[in-house]
Structure formats: C-alpha cells, structure tokens
A protein has these predicted regions:
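A short beta-loop-alpha structural element at the N-terminal edge
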Residues: 4-19
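Conserved GNAT-fold acetyl-CoA-binding loop/helix
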Residues: 22-47
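A short helix-loop-beta-strand connector motif used in the catalytic cores of GNAT acetyltransferases and
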Residues: 46-56, 65
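Conserved beta-strand in the GNAT
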Residues: 62-70, 77-82
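A short, internal acetyl-CoA/4′-phosphopantetheine-binding micro-motif in the GNAT/acyltransferase core
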Residues: 81-88, 115
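Conserved acetyl-CoA-binding loop-helix of GNAT-fold acetyltransferases
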Residues: 89-102, 122-127
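Conserved GNAT acetyl-CoA-binding A-motif
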Residues: 104-116
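Conserved acetyl-CoA-binding loop of GNAT-fold acetyltransferases
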Residues: 126-135
Length: 149
C-alpha cells in the first residue's frame, strides 16, 4: 500500500496550494460555470486561504495535495480536499476520508462538506457514508453521521 502522510502547511506552501487548487478544481469549475477565470480564481483563493489552516498531503514522500478540516464544537467540516490529477484514482482520497471518518467517530461528531454537484468526488464521499442534506444551484451539501459505538 502506498504511504499517505499529512503535515501542517506553512505560509510558504501558498503557491503549492494554489497549484493544487487549479489542477484539482479547474475541470469541474469549467463544467459548472463554463470557464476558468485565472485572475479571479487566484484572487478568491488568496482571499479565502490561510495556508496554516491546511495540511499538505504526501504520497510516498512527494506532495500531492492538501486538505483543510475546520473543527466546530458539534461537527468537523471538510472545507477542502484537493489532489493533483496524478494522485487521483489511487486510493489517496479514500484513505484521507477514512482517517477523517475515524477521527469524527472517536469524537462522536458528524462530518459536513460542500462539493460541486458535477464533481466525481461526490461518489467518494457517498462510499464513505455521506448523504446529501441539501443542494444549491451548483453545490451539494453532504453529511456523515458519526458511527455509534
């Protein structure tokens, strides 16, 4: 099995985070909205991103993505889980989601997330027990209830 590891992101990781964001999200944004405005995406990403809130995902020692989990008193929120295309479809996302599910189960809290409706990652979340709890014009809201002990 491939070794997936996480480390805390640092401010100097911002450019890597931007690159992962574009590589992971551009195809889905183009399908959902018709185009990718690079300047607008860069601006919005920079305004909404504190690198130190993220973790860098590594596969066999090489950085391949990032995740951002926001901790609330009553839930975990998976804000971002981005993988470079070469890491997609290799079980990395599934390992990360399984780890997050175990963490939520230990804390006895649900996990909530929002995903573009057209993003195939939606199936990954469904395989891990997430259910649709709402929809917007472009996104699906999902939640996984903590497993009972």
């Amino acid at each position: 099995m491939q070794r997936v590891a996480l480390r805390a992101a640092r401010s100097e990781d911002l450019e890597f985070l931007r690159r992962v964001h574009e590589a992971a999200m551009r195809p889905h944004v183009e399908r959902a909205f018709g185009s990718w405005d690079a300047d607008e995406q860069r601006r919005r990403f920079s305004e909404s991103t504190d690198p130190t809130s993220h973790e860098i995902v590594s596969l066999d020692g090489a950085p391949v993505g990032c995740q951002w989990v926001r901790v609330h008193a009553d839930a975990l929120e998976l804000v971002r889980l981005y993988l470079l295309p070469e890491a997609q479809g290799r079980g990395v996302g599934s390992q990360l989601v399984a780890q997050l599910c175990a963490r939520a189960d230990r804390a006895r809290v649900p996990i909530r997330l929002r995903v573009l409706a057209l993003n195939p990652a939606r199936r990954l979340y469904q395989r891990h027990g997430f259910c649709v709890t709402g929809e917007t014009e472009t996104h699906v809201l999902m939640e996984r209830v903590a497993a009972s002990r």
